[in-house]
From Swiss-Prot:
Family: Belongs to the AIR synthase family.
Keywords attached to this entry: ATP-binding, Cytoplasm, Ligase, Nucleotide-binding, Purine biosynthesis
Pathway in which this enzyme or protein is active: Purine metabolism; IMP biosynthesis via de novo pathway; 5-amino-1-(5-phospho-D-ribosyl)imidazole from N(2)-formyl-N(1)-(5-phospho-D-ribosyl)glycinamide: step 2/2
GO biological process: 'de novo' IMP biosynthetic process; adenine biosynthetic process
Protein name: Phosphoribosylformylglycinamidine cyclo-ligase
UniProt keyword annotation of Plastid present: no
UniProt GO molecular function: ATP binding; phosphoribosylamine-glycine ligase activity; phosphoribosylformylglycinamidine cyclo-ligase activity
Length: 361
């Protein structure tokens, strides 16, 4: 054996970052795969070129004069476990964007940019690229630029194939257009926009119900025979920006919005109400999608628990003045939204939400 062979042998026996489980070359390969998705989210104020130490956004180029910045962050929760087990990873990317962006929207903000955090035990470039492709689709739906993110390969932290996601979004609104407005009053009307399904809350309970039912992800969904169960449950969260933002910016008829996520109607509507007002909701008016009826029946879940765990068919609540109801409803329906007249604001000394009727589960 030559001296050079001895040197090569010694160098090959030494530890490397890749041998410890973190392969920088694989990470670089994934970056190349996702660049086209990222470029597809370009908008005024951002060039969406990645590789720097931070993402840049030009507020002046976005057309703001007296802006207030609004920030939000969120995740997808245990819906990810279904995505991992089914092997469909793009739709949870849309969920990630939706959970953050809809929270910006309720304060009247136009989404500007988005950043993601993707953590896994062993990086799979195809899996990662699928996730980012979904994030890009969500950003396109929201009009937000995907200006950066972090991919963390952490051996020993996650089981094989598992991953977690977190999203961070920033938007802006003119100071005068910040929601909720200060003129919320008794008699204002409460409208609801239909959800696309479960969205991204309550999946720990959903997964327990599926487990107890004995169903497999590949079985036909009992609530939708045209789809298998896994695909149906992975229907992505609806993003309401393109329907609501033009009304917020031009018509000025919306007084408040509430994104119906964890806690459902009873926890989220009161977040936008002043102390003197109460939301009176007619539960009988809600068209409950079949997936929620199946969940309630299969899990023997009471109405109150359904309402505080799931959106039950209403993904966004809108509060408007009575004179604006007809116009706003027409605009939203032209945008493809299903609008429900949910109720009215009343005065109550202690209650923040009151129910009439029953939820037709």
């Amino acid at each position: 054996m030559s001296n050079q062979d001895l040197i090569n042998c010694k160098s090959n026996s030494g530890l490397t970052y890749a041998k410890a489980g973190v392969d920088i070359d694989v990470g670089n390969a994934m970056v190349e795969k996702i660049k086209p998705f990222i470029r597809s989210t370009k908008r005024a104020g951002a060039d969406v070129e990645i590789g720097g130490f931070g993402g840049l956004f030009d507020l002046k180029a976005a057309g703001f004069t007296d802006p207030i910045l609004v920030a939000a962050n969120d995740g997808v929760g245990t819906k990810l476990k279904i995505a991992i087990e089914v092997g469909i990873h793009d739709t949870v990317g849309i969920d990630l964007v939706a959970m953050c962006i809809n929270d910006l929207l309720v304060q009247g903000a136009e989404p500007l940019f988005f950043l993601d955090y993707f953590a896994t035990g062993k990086l799979d470039p195809e899996q990662g690229a699928a996730i980012v492709s979904g994030i890009a689709v969500g950003c396109q739906q929201a009009g937000a630029a995907l200006i950066g993110g972090e991919t963390a390969e952490m051996p020993g932290m996650y089981a094989k194939g598992d991953y977690d996601l977190a999203g961070f979004a920033v938007g802006a609104t003119e100071r005068s257009a910040l929601l909720p407005s200060k003129d919320l009053a008794e008699g204002d009307i409460i409208l609801g926009l239909s959800s696309s399904g479960i969205h991204s809350n309550g999946f720990s309970l959903v997964r327990r119900i599926v487990q107890q039912s004995g169903l497999k992800w590949g079985d036909y969904a009992p609530f939708n025979p045209q789809m298998n169960l896994g695909t149906a449950l992975l229907t992505p969260t609806r993003i309401y920006v393109k329907s609501l933002l033009p009304i917020i910016k031009t018509y000025k008829g919306i007084k408040a919005l509430a994104h119906i996520t964890g806690g459902g109607l009873p926890e989220n509507i009161p977040r936008v109400l002043p102390s003197s007002l109460c939301a009176e909701i007619n539960l009988s008016a809600i068209h409950v999608p079949p997936v929620f009826s199946w969940i309630a029946k299969q899990g023997k879940i009471e109405e109150t628990e359904m309402l505080r765990t799931f959106n039950c068919g209403i993904g966004m609540v809108i509060i408007v003045a009575q004179h604006a109801v007809e116009t706003i409803t027409q605009i939203l329906e032209m945008q493809g939204e299903i609008v429900t007249l949910l109720g009215i604001l009343t005065k109550h000394p202690t209650k923040k939400i009151l129910y009439k009727g029953v939820l037709h589960l």
